Swiss-Prot record:
This is tRNA-2-methylthio-N(6)-dimethylallyladenosine synthase. It comes from Albidiferax ferrireducens (strain ATCC BAA-621 / DSM 15236 / T118). It is found in: Cytoplasm. Its cofactor is [4Fe-4S] cluster. Pfam families: Radical_SAM (PF04055), TRAM (PF01938), UPF0004 (PF00919). PANTHER family: CDK5 REGULATORY SUBUNIT-ASSOCIATED PROTEIN 1, MITOCHONDRIAL TRNA METHYLTHIOTRANSFERASE CDK5RAP1. The gene is miaB. Keywords: 4Fe-4S, Cytoplasm, Iron, Iron-sulfur, Metal-binding, S-adenosyl-L-methionine, Transferase, tRNA processing.
Amino acid sequence: MSKKVFIKTYGCQMNEYDSDKMSDVLGAAQGYEPTDNVEEADLILFNTCSVREKAQEKVFSDLGRVKHLKKKGALIGVGGCVASQEGAAIIERAPYVDVVFGPQTLHRLPQLLAERERLNRSQVDISFPEIEKFDHLPPARVEGASAFVSIMEGCSKYCSYCVVPYTRGEEVSRPFEDVLVEVAGLADQGVKEITLLGQNVNAWRSRMIGAASALSSEMADFATLLEYVSDIPGIERIRYVTSHPNEFTPSLIAAYDKLPKLVSHLHLPVQHGSDRILMAMKRGYTAMEYKSTVRKLRAIRPDMALSSDFIVGFPGETEDDFSKMMKLIDDVGFDNSFSFIFSPRPGTPAANLHDDTPHEVKLRRLQHLQTVINDSIKRISESRLGTVQRILVEGASKRDSTELMGRTECNRVVNFCGQPRLIGQMVDVAITETRSFTLRGEVVTQNEVLTG
């Protein structure tokens, strides 16, 4: 009987990608098969996030819930950014944990588990071996028409509030050809949509070698990579996340004019709308510069859907600062957002800033911001009524398993009736109804996809 591994993922899409790679490497090296039932798992892994305090504490709460499974012989591991930040302190707090590993050492999981068994003691490896992990991972295995590809690791921006540079290390780009080989392999498996991942994905840079360039010293930037990915047969859509406003170069903006496969959806975190707060955050741009980038993008793609991150209640935030953030939100018109009250992270400069704003004030501001964003989402959804949207069908609807769901180019979920054979296909859907954050529609494509 094969061994089972249960993986719970917290946080960002980088972690989702890493969790898939954990499953791949354990399957290839030790025959583990994934399971959604933690009770039957031989190995339980938590791939953690340390961006906010609540996410970090939830890990220890979840660890406590599976502690009893040790009696059945299950092994327990903690990976991700909390593991990188806390290291051996996790073992001190939860001594029943068997392995602790960082984002850059997930490829060493089989060796860590073997050492745990051989030495009969917990193992910790949270080193930063740069990009080594990609050299030791098996070829990607996918089910479905969409896939993530990590193209870089770490962050070198050192925003004053952010723990990522300390948990994932400095920015390191994957080699140009490695990325193209992985994308081509996924396309051969039927993947139609690729999402390129990185903490600051548009900061990617790599030397072009081999057939890709006659000049071995030529450097490729992110826009160049997008062009080459776009040329890979079978790839019909390209997304990427997360981008940094400071890395939005003229060549990247121009890519939206040259590459029709590059979708009209962008997650471009602004974090705040007050220049004073942006400076305290060490973001490196002003609200006007951010809006200038948006204007240039929408001059090329008027229907560009934008999502962003917002931090409410950063130390020293005044009502005037908050009003400036709300003005930016009104000026830009966001299709979605991820907004949170500031959470001080140990070891970051912002954790030491004086903060005298009452929590109830921060909560009121957050609720107001989210109400405004939700109203914007509703207006944008209503503007889609009566339009025909090109949908990549992903699978059964989460609301109703008898229906299908997919995403528009602008990343809006659409539910509709259709045959299972449409899964993995691109179809045209007429939008007939809007809901809070999703759309409903009817398939209007009339071709071999529907009749074959």
